């Protein structure tokens, strides 16, 4: 009889100065049969001692540590042992600059510590943390997407919770608008795309899965690097050429048509595809409000957020592009969008900015004829 060895568990090193947080993370990590806690330690020095005998597959790191702060520890890890790191921090406000710095130093993901108020929120937070850990290992293994999660989560809500579906309707010619969705690996990928755009770029609206309180710092950092203006979304903010609007963390972002132009709506509401903001919500609003005036772009990320409603965009006449597998950190969301029939073209990351500009020129030429 042939026997098969069980797949090796992903070993996680938890580094957090709070005993309560370490205990919480230990329970969360061990709720996933594919993950195991290698050690849970209170500071960077204890983490270094643990790593002398065994290297973890992923480090779950808080930024606020005694002795050596989390950013210094992260910098040393990347210099000595480039192990995937997921930063899980309660930082908001001014501390989010440190979270942006963590990404620039090489952290694979930055997520918020859970502040769950009920069983459903605790379950959703647990799933997001385990997903981030699993996705971090995938960035090293370069597989197309992690295996389906063995947990049994509650029902995954669709965009219907925020914006009801409706059959495609004719939409008048307006200015062009680009809608982008990204998740794991998206912060670096978005920087590559946006910094390659000239100030004359068409209007851009973005959902990047991020924690609450983090997107303002992310937008400021991008704005300092780009020829275009990059802003965190505010309700009724005008969508205009040379401007990219990034969804607030923990709030949905919708596109709204106003005469020949667009504004954005910022909404609370249920998690959609286990995310808030959700790419599906943005893409559905683009299908309904912009139709053939829109370009949808789905980029690196784990899961299927955006896949269903990118197909709605395409059915409504929009052009659609997925980032190719080779240039994705995690080829999850683009793969699912292709599987749902929503993708017109597949392009590498370094071609996306050019494709955005080509779309803007084609649309302008079409409308002036």
Swiss-Prot record:
CDD domains: CheB_Rec (cd16432), REC_CheB-like (cd17541)
SUPFAM superfamilies reported for this sequence: CheY-like (SSF52172), Methylesterase CheB, C-terminal domain (SSF52738)
Disulfide bridges in this chain: none
Pfam families found in the cross-reference section: CheB_methylest, Response_reg
GO biological process: chemotaxis
Annotated region described as Disordered, given as residue ranges: 136-168
Keyword hit for 4Fe-4S: no
Superkingdom of source: Bacteria
Catalysed reactions, semicolon-separated: [protein]-L-glutamate 5-O-methyl ester + H2O = L-glutamyl-[protein] + methanol + H(+); L-glutaminyl-[protein] + H2O = L-glutamyl-[protein] + NH4(+)
GO CC aspect terms: cytoplasm
Occurrences of domain Response regulatory (ranges): 11-128
Residue stretches making up the CheB-type methylesterase domain: 170-358
Keywords: Chemotaxis, Cytoplasm, Hydrolase, Phosphoprotein
Post-translational modification, as annotated: Phosphorylated by CheA. Phosphorylation of the N-terminal regulatory domain activates the methylesterase activity.
HAMAP family, per database record: CheB_chemtxs
Function: Involved in chemotaxis. Part of a chemotaxis signal transduction system that modulates chemotaxis in response to various stimuli. Catalyzes the demethylation of specific methylglutamate residues introduced into the chemoreceptors (methyl-accepting chemotaxis proteins or MCP) by CheR. Also mediates the irreversible deamidation of specific glutamine residues to glutamic acid.
NCBIfam families reported for this sequence: PRK00742.1, PRK12555.1
Entry similarity comment: Belongs to the CheB family.
Protein name: Protein-glutamate methylesterase/protein-glutamine glutaminase 1
């Amino acid at each position: 009889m042939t026997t098969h060895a069980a797949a090796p568990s992903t070993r996680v090193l938890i580094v957090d100065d709070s005993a309560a947080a370490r205990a919480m993370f230990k329970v969360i990590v061990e709720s996933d049969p594919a993950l195991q806690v290698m050690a849970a330690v209170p500071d960077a020095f204890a983490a270094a001692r643990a790593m002398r005998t065994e290297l973890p597959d992923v480090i779950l790191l808080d930024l606020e540590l005694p002795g050596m702060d989390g950013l210094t520890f992260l910098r040393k890890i990347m210099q000595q042992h480039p192990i995937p790191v997921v930063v899980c921090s309660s930082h908001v406000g001014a501390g989010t600059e440190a979270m942006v710095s963590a990404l620039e130093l090489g952290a694979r993901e930055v997520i918020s510590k859970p502040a769950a108020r009920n069983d459903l929120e605790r379950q959703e937070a647990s799933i997001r943390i385990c997903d981030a850990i699993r996705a971090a290992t995938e960035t090293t293994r370069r597989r197309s997407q992690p295996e389906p999660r063995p947990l049994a989560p509650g029902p995954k809500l669709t965009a219907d919770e925020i914006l009801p579906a409706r059959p495609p309707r004719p939409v008048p010619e307006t200015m062009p608008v680009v809608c982008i969705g990204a998740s794991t690996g998206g912060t670096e990928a978005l920087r590559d795309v946006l910094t390659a755009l000239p100030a004359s770029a068409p209007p851009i609206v973005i959902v990047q899965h991020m924690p609450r309180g983090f997107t303002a710092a992310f937008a400021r950092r991008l704005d300092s690097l780009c020829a275009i203006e990059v802003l965190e979304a505010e309700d009724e903010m005008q969508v205009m050429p040379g401007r990219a609007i990034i969804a607030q963390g923990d709030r949905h972002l919708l596109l709204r048509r106003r005469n020949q132009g667009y504004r954005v709506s910022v909404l609370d509401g249920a998690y959609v595809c286990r995310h808030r903001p959700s790419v599906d919500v943005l893409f559905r609003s683009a299908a309904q409000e912009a139709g053939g005036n829109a370009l949808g772009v789905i980029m690196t990320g784990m899961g299927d957020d955006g896949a269903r409603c990118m197909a709605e965009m395409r059915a409504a006449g929009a052009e659609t592009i997925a980032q190719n597998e080779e240039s994705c950190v995690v080829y999850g969301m683009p793969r699912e969008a292709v599987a749902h029939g929503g993708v017109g073209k597949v392009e590498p990351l370094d071609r996306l900015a050019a494709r955005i500009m080509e779309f803007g020129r084609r649309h302008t030429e079409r409308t002036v004829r």
